[in-house]
Regions:
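Short, intrinsically disordered N-terminal pre-domain segments
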Residues: 1-13, 185-186
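Extracellular jelly-roll beta-sandwich "head" domains, especially the C-terminal globular C1q domain
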Residues: 32-186
Length: 186
């Protein structure tokens, strides 16, 4: 096999392309970073019957995970942000039921005055069982919020179902959990 040499500078003005791992940056500088500087995950550790805000049994994920940055703080299911900025929040719920038909709702709620909460997003599902086996569910909600004051902007999570539903908590894996990613500055 023959290899040819190509002169890439002929007919090119301005910046010369660079191959084989070069940066092609002939002048200027790179400022800042696009890497995440805050990432955190929390999960619910015990099974429960969903009936409103999830206020108990939260722990920071400790299985094959290490937070980036300061991380969120939690008290009775209310999460406080470590810094201002644009944040992505994911809320995942999983569970099982033994009834005939069940509606499932999960919501992310935020306050900007440390008092009244409103929903950022809602996700839901309606499950209908056709046999006598246990049926499992998974619902995901996601929102992007602008946190401008860490003293007053907080978030909590809502999960509600009809009866005979069990939300599956766990300590060794994520079944009911929240993910927090700081995407950038306000």
């Amino acid at each position: 096999m023959a290899f040819a040499t190509i002169d890439v500078t002929k007919g090119i003005t301005g910046v010369t392309p660079v191959a084989n791992g070069g940066t092609a940056l002939s002048s200027g500088f790179v400022n800042g970073s696009t890497a995440l500087n805050e990432a955190d995950q929390w999960r619910v550790t015990a099974d429960f019957t969903p009936a409103g805000y999830v206020t108990a049994n939260w722990e920071r994920v400790d299985t094959n995970f290490a937070k980036i940055g300061t991380g969120m703080s939690e008290s009775s299911g209310v999460f406080t942000f470590p810094s201002t900025g644009i944040w992505r929040i994911d809320w995942d719920t999983n569970g099982k039921y033994n009834g005939s038909s069940r509606e499932i709702a999960t919501r992310i709620a935020i306050t900007t005055d440390d008092a009244s909460y409103g929903y950022v997003t809602e996700a839901g599902s309606f499950l209908s069982r056709t046999d006598s086996n246990t049926t499992y569910y998974s619902v995901h909600a996601q929102g992007i919020v602008d946190i401008t004051n860490v003293s007053t902007h907080k978030v909590k999570f809502f999960h509600n179902t009809e009866d005979t539903v069990t939300a599956d908590g766990a300590t060794g894996e994520n079944k009911i959990y929240a993910t927090f990613l700081r995407l950038g500055d306000t």
